């Protein structure tokens, strides 16, 4: 029987189907980690792919934006819609969390509070009032009541913090299984008034970095979860109702595998596009530099001011470079408001979903 107090669960987690799926998920995750190292500046992947994850993770919570709106807003000084701001907050919280684990080598409750504060733009902290219940969106029926008292929330989160940061030697559990378990436990504690789902999904990828399964946070599960949203919530609740973990484990490991495959494909395409741009720009333009290539792939959109700062060149020079690259078919020039923006055609084609 399921109990939130019994964590990690004592159930038999490593069934034959789970072990089979676990091996496959690890294989593709390791391949993703390796191929990310083919990009000279891995910050490019964090910047571009985190925007996709931010969009998809927010969509699970019914915060809907388009990729194009998001990319434009990322380089525009004009006010964004509330939905765009929510998505930008997610990307900012993800970057914040990655910085914290890089600096401290661990993920504490204080770090989780900081991530959630960056996400929600408030400092409400852990829930202090009772009354939080999880309901079926369609029927309004209460399907789960998380811990109601602050003392219980703090105690359970302290235990979860210890689980995240222990050395996993006393009763070793595979790190991917640990990630799946801690995600369920965090969602079940539901420690915040708002932002639990998105904070939990940030914790997932940070945990993979913390355990060395990835170097940078580029496994973004949310696109898979958006496509299979009803099953995600059904299996979360199925564990609580029955204490059976296998279905939840298989679902999340499949999410890891499929997302890793998508990530491998995306990174390979970005790598090839960078090599193509590098070769053709170096061949045809005297102003070629690796810094220029990195800049063009750091974000799908750029503008004169940004290139001036990156390359430390004058406004006329930056404008000349971008206009010549537009004439050469590398960029697409678009006027938005009073500013000209330059869109990396190859990168945009890679990042915009085709389905």
Describe the predicted segments one by one.
Residues 1-355:
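FIC/Doc superfamily catalytic core
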